Amino acid sequence: MPVPASWPHLPSPFLLMTLLLGRLTGVAGEEELQVIQPDKSISVAAGESATLHCTVTSLIPVGPIQWFRGAGPGRELIYNQKEGHFPRVTTVSDLTKRNNMDFSIRISNITPADAGTYYCVKFRKGSPDHVEFKSGAGTELSVRAKPSAPVVSGPAARATPQHTVSFTCESHGFSPRDITLKWFKNGNELSDFQTNVDPAGDSVSYSIHSTAKVVLTREDVHSQVICEVAHVTLQGDPLRGTANLSETIRVPPTLEVTQQPVRAENQVNVTCQVRKFYPQRLQLTWLENGNVSRTETASTLTENKDGTYNWMSWLLVNVSAHRDDVKLTCQVEHDGQPAVSKSHDLKVSAHPKEQGSNTAPGPALASAAPLLIAFLLGPKVLLVVGVSVIYVYWKQKA
């Protein structure tokens, strides 16, 4: 029986089978697609490039791949296969190649701020917006960053020997968090210090702050305090920061006042020796009985081996100008500190008066007068007595 021309043409069994298999294949492709991120975590040094691997097992459903840092509504778009400008991101494979399933990316010039978990996400093509289809498990990127050079700071004001002063050491921007810090004075490790690493929790980078206590001695002008930082990112020696104790210490002077004889009559040379002081800034004032005689600023200093200085000032005193004893004072102002002083008592002796014509003879001269008279008049007396005796003799004989 012939088939009427008005009946619809029924699909052949082959066509039905083809359509059915195509539909089943598409559904199976969607169900079987997997987004594979083989690296659970990677670590990259700051300044280098990081490669984030991602492959898919199917090209179905049709739609782009996008990369994000973080998950949830606040995640950050790192790369979009179809649109956008991402100057630091390049693809590892040729995405224009047919049947490409490798969507790995490379991020250049990594900084600590790039640390985080990166997700490779497959989208299904939609209109007007694409719909997220499946995400990879994520790859955690950690950044190894070197610590900055340690900066050591001392106290704001100078301190004298036997006092305890504090020094601080800071270093920033390193990752991971583990770090070692040590203090040294002249090569000897210090133990009295406290160290903190911030923040306490997870962070893209960290900072370290340490405070050490140092007891000053008179020999510390040439001493150094060193802060040493060791970190996994440092290939060679640890980083070091240094502070010179010459910028911290003040060594007060010791004074000695002495009297030196001079050849000139009625003059005495008094010297003031200022010893073992640091820093150099010093002013000296001479006082006679409390009155200022002379003020001078230290110059032409003598440096000692320990870094301290010596200086000597002298004062020439005219003794004849004084009727009474003189108190000489050497007063020193060092580095803006209250003055210190040392005194010396200068004895003024009574001077003998010149003898005049009316000056009474002393006891010694009075006792010697009779002897002197006898010595001068003795021969004359004997002569007179002799002449008298001869005259009497001739008178009687006649």
Swiss-Prot record:
Primary residence: membrane
Residue ranges annotated for the Ig-like V-type domain, each copy included: 31-136
Keyword set, alphabetical order: Disulfide bond, Glycoprotein, Immunoglobulin domain, Membrane, Repeat, Signal, Transmembrane, Transmembrane helix
CDD domains referenced in this protein's UniProt entry, alphabetically: IgC1_SIRP_domain_2, IgC1_SIRP_domain_3, IgV_SIRP
Pfam family for this entry, one: C1-set
Signal peptide: 1-29
Protein localization: Membrane
A GO cellular-component term linked to this record: membrane
Glycosites: N244, N291, N318
Basic and acidic residues: compositionally biased ranges: 337-354
TM region(s), chain numbering: 372-392
Disulfide-linked positions: C54-C120, C169-C227, C272-C330
Residues in the Extracellular compartment per record: 30-371
InterPro entries to which the protein is assigned, alphabetical: Ig-like_CS_Receptor (IPR051755), Ig-like_dom (IPR007110), Ig-like_dom_sf (IPR036179), Ig-like_fold (IPR013783), Ig_C1-set (IPR003597), Ig_sub (IPR003599), Ig_V-set (IPR013106)
Domain of life: Eukaryota
Protein's membrane topology: Single-pass type I membrane protein
Function: Immunoglobulin-like cell surface receptor involved in the negative regulation of receptor tyrosine kinase-coupled signaling processes.
Name under which the protein is recorded: Signal-regulatory protein beta-1 isoform 3
